[in-house]
């Protein structure tokens, strides 16, 4: 996976933080007497995933790993260590998730809180700790400090600290949601194929949540109509201008004349499309996901809400203008990613309409 857009590693601040993390993880990598491969398929019941991300999207990208763990270790409980404040709600539907431990936003600025948290991790006596991300030394350091019996993660020259089951990153697989699943399968002694089936992102919405979302959507659109949801917000260079969206939606609406269009509002609560369409706002990701799950098509740029839509099960079109598509695309049935770099909006709209043509 490239480090495009989301993973600039060249700033002096990040270099200093990387050196601190390397010191933090020195020589602390779990039980060094454990065998290299394979990881035992039984006797593992307490599992820790360390992912020090703050974002909604990267938290949802852990759900394929949760699905793989659920299948491989059906009697296990998984704790998640994260900086994402929304993680407890995002993962609330997963029966195998026990505790979601929230790291302080500035970990090195809260030494007392961190010391207390790390003591708790060591006291939990985890059987397995997983470092799920290829480019984070912080995740590796947290795995090391957990002192779990076994530790699994992808290995690269960017990583510091040993694991009992370090897995070389594959050359032909880059997706951030699939890579930790690959690592676990490889640690179990398998030779996974990059083209094999991987669990999808999954919000695990309940029937009651979906029904409430359907009612909210019906309230917005009036009579029962097929509906397209549009989320026009993305950060920085991943965003599209208002004029771009206007041209895109003219073509999309013409291709789907029987569909209503609903705007999904960003955290600011303001329309980015000039209040031309009925709009829905929620500060609660599961409530938002419940409504999106009832859409016939969801369209957005590359962002966390794109992954939320995919995890809700909605047909999802992700529009990429800057990020690495191979590393962050939406995958699975009724999901598609489109490279919009340098392409006119009308052409991208036509591609989306052709891919998701509902007749």
Predicted ranges, named:
Residues 1-359:
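Catalytic machinery of carbohydrate-active enzymes
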């Amino acid at each position: 996976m490239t480090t495009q857009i989301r993973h600039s590693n060249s700033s002096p601040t990040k270099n200093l933080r990387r050196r601190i993390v390397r010191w933090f993880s020195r020589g602390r990598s779990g039980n060094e007497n454990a065998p290299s491969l394979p990881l035992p398929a039984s006797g593992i019941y307490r599992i820790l995933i360390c992912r020090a991300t703050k974002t909604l999207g990267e938290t949802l990208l852990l759900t394929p790993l949760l699905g793989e763990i659920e299948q491989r270790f059906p009697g296990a409980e998984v704790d998640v260590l994260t900086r994402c404040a929304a993680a407890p709600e995002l993962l609330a539907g997963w029966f195998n998730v026990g505790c979601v431990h929230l790291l302080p936003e500035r970990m090195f600025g809260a030494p007392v809180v961190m010391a207390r948290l790390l003591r708790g991790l060591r006291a939990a006596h985890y059987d397995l700790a997983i470092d799920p991300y290829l480019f984070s030394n912080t995740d590796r350091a947290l795995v090391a400090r957990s002192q779990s019996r076994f530790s699994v993660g992808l290995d690269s020259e960017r990583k510091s600290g040993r694991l009992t089951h370090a897995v070389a990153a594959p050359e032909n697989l880059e997706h951030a949601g699939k890579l930790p699943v690959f690592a676990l399968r490889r640690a179990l002694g398998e030779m996974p194929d990059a083209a094999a089936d991987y669990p999808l992102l999954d919000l695990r919405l309940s029937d009651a949540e979906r029904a409430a979302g359907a009612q909210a959507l019906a309230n917005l659109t009036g009579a029962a109509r097929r509906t397209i949801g549009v989320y026009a917000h993305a950060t920085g260079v991943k965003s599209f201008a208002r004029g771009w969206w206007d041209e895109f939606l003219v073509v999309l609406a013409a291709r789907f004349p029987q569909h209503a269009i609903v705007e999904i509002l960003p955290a600011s609560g303001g329309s980015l499309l000039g209040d031309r369409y009925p709009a829905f706002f929620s500060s609660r990701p599961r409530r938002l996901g419940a409504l999106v799950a009832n859409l016939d098509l969801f369209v957005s740029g590359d962002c966390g809400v794109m992954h939320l839509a995919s995890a809700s099960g909605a047909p999802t079109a992700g529009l990429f203008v800057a990020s690495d598509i191979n590393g962050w695309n939406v995958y699975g049935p009724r999901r598609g990613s489109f490279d919009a770099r340098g392409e006119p909006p009308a052409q991208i709209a036509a591609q989306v309409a052709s891919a998701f043509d509902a007749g």
